[in-house]
Every structure is written in structure tokens, then in C-alpha cells.
Regions:
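The transition from N-terminal targeting/processing segments to the mature protein
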Residues: 1-99
Length: 99
């Protein structure tokens, strides 16, 4: 089981990404939601991860790569997918949004 999970709000005009820590069958928020394109969600998440010295660099890279993939998918195909459908594409993340 992963130690961390990205929670994603999949919306029409933006996508928002937050980081949670996994503990058993529950998750605990580590960050607020960072929005794209209103702000640079990737950069904000990176800056937050840089302050968490207890998150190994290799795990931070994986989380940032997932964030890149999610943002790119939203930009290219966002309105074609419901939150439920996009969850099938990014199985290691948790998605909420309109269906």
C-alpha cells in the first residue's frame, strides 16, 4: 500500500490536487488543494513537498510525476471524462467531481 495518495477534484474549469497520507484504511490531509490553471498546482505541491523532509525524494518525484500526468490529461481531455472514468486511468489517485 502507498504511503501517500493524491486527491483530485476534477472540475469543468479547473483541476485541484491535494496530498494525503495513508494510514490503514483512512487518509489524512497533508496539504490544501492546489488548483490548476488558476495557480501553478505543480509548483505549489513541489514547494510543499520540499518542506517535508520526512518524504523521501523518490516518493516526491513519483507524486509530482502523477501531478503532471493529471494536469496534462485534464488540459487535453478533461471535459471528455467524468471523475469516475478518469479514476480508471489513474488508479493510485482518488478523484471526486461531476459525473
Amino acid at each position: 500500500m502507498n504511503k501517500f495518495v493524491l486527491k483530485v477534484l476534477w472540475l469543468d474549469k479547473s483541476v485541484a490536487i491535494a496530498l494525503d497520507q495513508c494510514a490503514g484504511n483512512t487518509t489524512h490531509p497533508l496539504t490544501e488543494y492546489f488548483f490548476w490553471p488558476r495557480k501553478d498546482a505543480w509548483e505549489e505541491l513541489k514547494n510543499q513537498l520540499d518542506t517535508y523532509s520526512w518524504i523521501p525524494p523518490n516518493e516526491a518525484i513519483v507524486l509530482l510525476n502523477q501531478t503532471t500526468d493529471i494536469i496534462n490529461c485534464w488540459q487535453e481531455e478533461g471535459k471528455q471524462y467524468s471523475a469516475k472514468k478518469i479514476q480508471e486511468k489513474f488508479t493510485q489517485c482518488l478523484f471526486v467531481g461531476h459525473d
